[in-house]
């Protein structure tokens, strides 16, 4: 959230004196004009503060959802004079599509009844025998025979454990002449020259830090409870060595989003310690690039200047979905990347207005909810890109044409610096980009998939608070790229990283590095 301007100070006595002077001079119109101007300024301040308060409360209460119930929407629409047009042919209700996004289809959630435990988990059978007093038939006295078992399952947890791998290198000597010297088997390859750590241990450190958001000092304490004392610098060296080994893999991942049919881009800030900074730290940025929702690449920049995304994205040709960050404009002006707007960003400003009590924004939200309903319906029906594009043209375009007419009407009435005026202005300025999803059925309606890719970074940031250096931030970008792409391929992160690290330690040829990329690895292991 941007820093709010200071609260406006009003000299009430001065205002009264000024108005009194104008009235005494017979300048009633001028006095009324000044009153109107002052009230407009104060109203804008009030709306801004109400909006800021709503944002702070949502963050404090950790309410990240932007859903609005059908009942809320109906009540808000009753408070405004302008009503949206009748809905198009039947589509899912607002309740069914509230928060419907363009993510890949996930397994359908089951109800709240007892769920079957995953089949891949190991089973330990515990037999429970009928008590001796009940083993005989109460009617005839004969012993009852076993006819089967009534089975129920409970979930147990076995704490993760460390183990020591003892490498015994064969030593051979000649017993006959005793002059041929001793032959010793070569040592096993290691990621760290003098390291004591297997690929599984290194993978655990990486997954714990970057997937489970566990800082190194907490990992050190966990290992210490097992009697293994490790210096923080040792764990840091492990991360550094893993980064060096995995960097070629991350670079190959980086190429795929740029070549994808749909490129989605977003960024988030990260605090980086800097001894040369007066504050002791600087705000760097991690840029996320999502390619066809299969590839996730992250890059670090020390500032938010436009030159950094330009260096990353200037070679892009084709669709590029992002927010309205002005730093992307130079990329679009090259004429190769085509801007695709994000309806989640457009909706967010309007939702915040409703949250702050401005009922006018509910009209626009109603239009947008209906467009999302069309998307949800297309997903449920499993439409292919061509069919989805046709459905959008038939159902969504008329809704958006009506929404644009309403936005233009409101734009002429709302103060441009008010929260509602800014939300409406954003939609109008971005309108051409916001309509692009209508032209290609493979384009998502919003950029929330990329926002989700950044979520682990936001969660991790709350735990480790900062990167220790710019080098550490770049290491994080590398590991996030690999783990993020592995997550999109639905891979278990530790198993994948352990196998890849072991392959690299064993001398995997760089010319075959693509075989270790998450989609290729998933395919190879699914056929075993």
Report the location of each language-model feature.
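Conserved beta-strand -> loop -> alpha-helix junction used to position metal-binding or nucleic-acid-contacting
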Residues: 262, 324, 335-366
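Short, amphipathic alpha-helical "recognition" segments used to contact nucleic acids or chromatin
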Residues: 199-212
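Residues on one face of amphipathic alpha-helical coiled coils
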Residues: 41, 48-51, 55, 248, ...
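Gly/Pro-rich turn-and-neighbor structural signature
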Residues: 134, 138, 217-315, 379-442, ...
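Short helix/loop capping segments that flank catalytic or ligand/cofactor-binding pockets
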Residues: 146-148, 182-185, 272-274, 297-299, ...
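Short, flexible loop/hinge motifs at secondary-structure junctions
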Residues: 1-196, 264-265, 271, 527
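Acidic/histidine-rich catalytic cores and adjacent linkers
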Residues: 317-318, 324-327, 366-528
């Amino acid at each position: 959230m941007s820093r709010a301007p200071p609260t406006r100070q009003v000299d009430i006595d001065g205002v009264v004196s000024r108005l009194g002077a104008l009235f005494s001079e017979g300048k009633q119109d001028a006095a009324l004009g000044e009153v109107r101007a002052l009230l407009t300024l104060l109203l804008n301040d009030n709306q801004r503060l109400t909006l800021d308060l709503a944002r702070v409360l949502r963050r404090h209460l950790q309410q990240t959802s932007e859903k609005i119930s059908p009942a809320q929407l109906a009540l808000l629409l009753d408070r405004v004079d302008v009503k949206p047009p009748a809905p198009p042919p039947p589509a899912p209700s607002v309740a069914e599509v509230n928060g419907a996004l363009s993510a890949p289809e996930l397994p359908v959630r089951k109800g709240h009844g007892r769920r079957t435990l995953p089949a891949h988990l190991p089973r330990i059978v515990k037999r429970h025998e009928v008590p001796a007093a009940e083993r005989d038939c109460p009617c005839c006295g004969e012993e009852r025979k076993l006819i089967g078992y009534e089975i129920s399952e409970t979930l147990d947890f076995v704490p993760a454990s460390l183990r020591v791998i003892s490498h015994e290198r064969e030593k051979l000597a000649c017993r006959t002449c005793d002059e041929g010297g001793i032959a010793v088997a070569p040592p096993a390859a290691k990621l760290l020259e003098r390291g004591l750590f297997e690929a599984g241990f290194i993978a655990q450190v990486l997954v714990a830090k970057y997937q489970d958001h566990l800082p190194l000092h907490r990992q050190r304490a966990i290992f210490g409870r097992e009697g293994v004392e490790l210096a923080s610098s040792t764990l840091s060296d492990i991360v550094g060595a893993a980064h060096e080994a995995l960097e070629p893999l991350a670079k190959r991942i980086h190429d795929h989003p740029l070549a994808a049919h749909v490129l989605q881009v977003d960024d988030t800030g990260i605090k980086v310690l800097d001894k040369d900074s007066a504050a002791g730290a600087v705000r760097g940025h991690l840029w996320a690039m999502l390619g066809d929702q299969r590839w996730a690449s992250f890059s670090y920049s020390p500032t938010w200047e436009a030159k950094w995304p330009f260096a990353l994205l200037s070679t892009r040709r084709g669709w590029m979905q992002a927010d309205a960050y002005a730093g992307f404009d130079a990329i679009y002006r090259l004429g190769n990347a085509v801007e695709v707007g994000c309806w989640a960003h457009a909706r967010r400003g309007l939702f915040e207005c409703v949250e702050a009590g401005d009922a006018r924004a509910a009209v626009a939200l109603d239009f947008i909810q209906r467009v999302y309903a069309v998307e949800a319906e297309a997903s449920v029906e499993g439409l292919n890109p061509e069919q989805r594009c046709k459905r959008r043209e038939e159902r969504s375009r008329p809704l958006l044409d009506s929404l644009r007419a309403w936005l233009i009407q409101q734009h002429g009435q709302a103060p441009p610096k008010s929260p509602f005026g800014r939300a409406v202005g954003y939609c109008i300025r971005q309108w051409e980009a916001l309509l692009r999803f209508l032209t290609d059925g493979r384009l998502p309606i919003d950029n929330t998939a990329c926002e989700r890719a950044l979520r682990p970074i936001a969660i991790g940031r709350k735990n480790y608070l900062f990167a220790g250096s710019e080098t550490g931030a770049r290491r994080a970008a590398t590991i996030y790229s690999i783990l993020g792409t592995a997550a999109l391929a639905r891979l278990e992160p530790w198993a994948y990283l352990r196998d890849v690290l072991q392959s690299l330690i064993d001398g995997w040829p760089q010319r075959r590095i693509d075989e270790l990329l998450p989609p290729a690895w998933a395919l190879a292991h699914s056929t075993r």
